[in-house]
Design a protein with these regions (language model features):
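A composition-driven surface/loop motif
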Residues: 1-492
Length: 492
């Protein structure tokens, strides 16, 4: 068993350490291998070095105490199969780990040492990354942190992150990628990733009930948080994504019960070219604050689920280009929807936004009291709002500049499908299902919608009225001018 206080210093010339080379570690040039449990403190700077915890080694605490370490062709830190390791970032210290483009066996198949991550946790390893210091990871090869799978041979695998300040720059692939179980319990994370910011093939937990949770700032990514089972229990999360901000999915799993559950914390998310929250199963929101915007294009949906979307608590503002196709929404807590259905979200739509980008807006009750106040992240044709202040069957007005749009709060099973009816603003049809005056049944792009039987019903007189403008919509067929931003006293 190694001493509980073995200290190593990295330099470009090698690694120096106190104690006998047989006492739980081996040094080979700038490569340090830990072979026995104990506490090991590492510091210094090295342009090409590495730390490895040997397979099946348990009870290891690796203390980063002002370490700057780059590894050219492998991981800077590797936790072997079936190992149990705590990587502790020492209080008040700044530490940096990085690799090079050679640490990627897809691009460098001849590199037998490539681990495809700056920190590699192999199958069956249980790793905790924690401490009160700061760690910056730069992943020039592939991933920032990679955690392995649970296997019969190697045992259960998990990765837990807590307390520390963690900065990850991953210009090639994922910032954090886990195969089995990933718990981000607390700490401050800042992430810039080419692909996923935080990804887990199976279970991803953010925060925990009754805790403040982590602060996560994802400045750039393709997808933000992704797991087959995605649970957000607490935390303060900001996401700027080009695809889905939150995604419950795994293309390698078939016949799986995908779930996305948001029970606490604050999420402020924006997608420039994808869905806001996308679940391949059910999507459930029970608490705290969810603000999600998707760019104002036809196929971007702020909330999207193959199963049921349930809103039963918290403050929820979901705004975007469209409501998508049929949204199976169960509003245990009443929701008010603006621009919900009709033609506004369909491809080829010329519908203008309910609310324009950067517009300040409010949602007010019948007495003029603001139940929500915010600023639009982008233009939106569709806005869903829910909070504890919203009362079923009551009227709420969305106001942005000189524009206002009325809505009525609904509870229970709420239809937001893109049929011929509903959602008069931008929908081209009145809530009662009658064609508005001056409307000839055309889509905004001039194409007639197909009805189930393929026929367009005749008006009672047998003729269609001629639109005043000669076009197929009242005035321009667009939603009321202006932007829509919601504001419920929490601000967006």
């Amino acid at each position: 068993q190694a001493s509980s206080d073995v200290t190593f210093t990295f330099t470009d010339g090698g690694v120096t350490g106190a104690g006998d080379s047989t006492a739980g570690y081996e040094i080979d040039g700038t490569a340090l291998t830990i072979t026995s449990g104990g506490t090991y403190t590492v510091s210094g700077s090295c342009a090409d070095g590495s730390i490895k915890v040997k397979k099946s080694t348990t009870g290891v605490t690796l203390v980063l105490d002002g370490l700057t370490l780059t590894s050219e062709n492998t991981a800077a830190i590797t936790c072997g199969k079936s190992s149990e390791v705590t990587i502790l970032v020492s209080n008040g210290t700044e530490n940096s780990l990085s690799d090079t483009e050679q640490n990627n066996d897809d691009n460098y198949p001849e590199n037998e040492n490539a681990e495809n991550a700056v920190i590699k946790c192999k199958d069956g390893s249980t790793v905790t990354l924690c401490g009160d210091g700061e760690l910056t990871i730069t992943a020039n090869g592939k991933n920032g942190i990679k955690s392995g799978a649970t296997t019969d041979e190697d045992g259960e695998a998990s990765l837990t992150i807590r307390d520390l300040t963690l900065n990850i720059d991953a210009p090639v692939n994922d910032a954090i990628n886990a195969e089995q179980l990933l718990n981000v319990e607390s700490g401050t994370l800042t992430i810039d990733a080419a692909d996923d910011a935080i990804h887990c093939d199976l279970v991803l937990n953010i925060g925990a009930d009754g805790t403040d949770g982590p602060t996560i700032d994802i400045t750039n990514c393709c997808e933000g948080l992704e797991g087959a089972e995605l649970n957000v229990c607490s935390g303060d999360i900001t996401i700027n994504a080009s695809d889905d901000c939150l995604n419950a999915a795994n293309s390698d799993l078939t016949d799986y019960d995908f779930t996305m559950t948001i029970s606490g914390g604050t999420i402020d998310a924006y997608s420039s070219a994808g869905d806001g929250f996308d679940s391949n199963g059910d999507l459930t929101i029970t608490g705290d604050t969810v603000i999600v915007w998707t760019a104002n294009t036809a196929d971007n949906e702020p909330l999207d689920a193959d199963g049921t979307i349930t809103v039963s608590g918290g403050t929820v503002l979901a705004a975007g280009g469209s409501s998508g196709m049929d949204m199976n929404l169960e509003a245990a807590q009443p929701c008010v929807i603006y621009g919900s259905t009709g033609f506004g979200g369909m491809p080829g739509s010329t519908q203008s936004s309910l609310i324009a980008a950067d517009a300040d807006f409010t949602i007010e009750d019948a007495d003029g009291n603001a139940v929500y106040r915010g600023t639009a992240r982008c233009g939106a044709n569709f806005i869903l709002f829910s909070s504890a202040d919203v009362v079923a069957d009551s009227a709420y007005t969305l106001k942005a500049g000189d524009s206002s749009t009325e809505g009525t709060a609904q509870s229970g099973t709420v239809s937001t499908g893109m049929g011929m009816g509903g959602g008069f603003p931008g929908g081209g049809q009145k809530p009662d299902g009658e064609l508005p005056e001056g409307f000839d049944g055309q889509m905004p792009n001039g194409e007639k919608p197909e009805l189930p039987d393929g026929e367009v019903p005749e008006m009672p007189s047998g003729e269609r009225p001629t639109p005043p403008s000669g076009q197929g919509s009242p005035t321009d067929g667009n939603a009321p001018a202006g932007d829509s931003t919601s504001d419920t006293t929490p601000t967006a």
